């Protein structure tokens, strides 16, 4: 009988600890998802070719910053623009090698920072990133690119942003590089003993949107991705409509350009599927 009170106290202690962890997970959800960096470590001029340092506004008035790299005027793909939506960490100055690879395909490239990243105002949120991508899309439209000539390229979390843009606007193509199926799916993998699917308020549910999209899709994912497992890319690809292409990357999650020429080859093959590209 003397053990019962001790057992009760132990169970209460375990329960309270569990509840505390659950509350902390909810409290720190935003900081777990978004890792913005305000400091630009370079400018677009570092690429050694023409670029525009762009200021534009989202629909809620938030001022955003982006870099536009025009394609060479003699490029047969100069009429196409790649709208680059980066991942959850850093800012646009940390992806220069990726811009070089995209530009190597002969398209124009417009990279932008979500609110709260780099020189863009505000604080990031899921709906905020969606608004920001739409604002970047509208900037390209005003630049003279028809919607069907704009390809949304999403890196990791940016794939969720790009997929939502494809659901809201007309696009010529969609690229998902190392993109998870959803934040709840990722959370359940990282914390299988916590009810993350019911607690989370940030979703980026890419997979659920793909069956509704009617746009050419390229899924790029590495079998050795240690953060967003290969099965996420496979599931996203399986959920999408034709035409679609799956391209296995080399390297880890944060090193998609481990083989730059292989990366570019995947983009080239995808562009060949797009009418008029």
PLM region spans:
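Catalytic active-site module of serine/aspartate enzymes centered on a nucleophile-bearing elbow/loop
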Residues: 260-277
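Short beta-strand/loop motif that positions the catalytic acidic residue
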Residues: 212-214, 219-221, 225
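Catalytic histidine-centered segment of alpha/beta-hydrolase-like enzymes
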Residues: 252-262
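An N-terminal hydrophobic leader/cap segment in hydrolases
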Residues: 10-57
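Short alpha-helix in the alpha/beta-hydrolase fold that links the catalytic acid
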Residues: 98, 206, 215, 229-238
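Membrane-embedded segments
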Residues: 59-139, 143, 148
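Acidic catalytic loop of the alpha/beta-hydrolase fold
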Residues: 223-228, 253-255
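Primarily recognizes the serine-hydrolase "nucleophile elbow" in alpha/beta-hydrolase
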Residues: 136-143, 147-193, 209
């Amino acid at each position: 009988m003397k053990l019962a009170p001790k057992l009760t106290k132990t169970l209460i202690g375990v329960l309270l600890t569990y509840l505390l962890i659950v509350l902390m997970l909810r409290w720190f959800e935003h900081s777990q998802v978004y890792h913005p960096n305000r400091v630009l470590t370079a400018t677009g001029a570092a690429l050694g070719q023409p670029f525009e340092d762009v200021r534009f506004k989202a629909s809620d008035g938030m001022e955003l910053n982006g870099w536009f790299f025009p394609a060479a005027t003699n490029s047969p793909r100069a009429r196409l623009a790649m709208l680059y939506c980066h991942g959850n960490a850093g800012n646009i100055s940390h992806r220069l090698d990726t811009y070089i690879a995209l530009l190597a395909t002969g398209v124009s490239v417009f990279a932008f920072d979500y609110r709260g990243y780099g020189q863009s105002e505000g604080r990031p949120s899921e709906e905020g990133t969606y608004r920001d991508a739409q604002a970047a899309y509208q900037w390209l439209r005003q630049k003279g690119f028809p919607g069907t000539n704009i390809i949304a390229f999403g890196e990791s979390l940016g794939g969720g942003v790009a997929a939502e843009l494809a659901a809201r606007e007309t696009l010529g193509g969609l690229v998902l590089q190392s993109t998870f199926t959803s934040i709840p799916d990722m959370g359940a993998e990282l914390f299988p003993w916590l009810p993350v699917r019911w607690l989370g308020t940030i979703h980026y549910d890419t997979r659920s949107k793909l069956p509704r999209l009617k746009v050419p899709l390229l899924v790029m994912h590495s079998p050795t991705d240690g953060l967003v497992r290969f099965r996420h890319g496979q599931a996203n690809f399986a959920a999408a409509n034709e035409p679609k292409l799956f391209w296995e990357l080399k390297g880890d999650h944060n090193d998609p350009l481990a083989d730059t020429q292989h990366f570019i080859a995947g983009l080239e093959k995808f562009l060949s599927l797009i009418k008029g590209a």
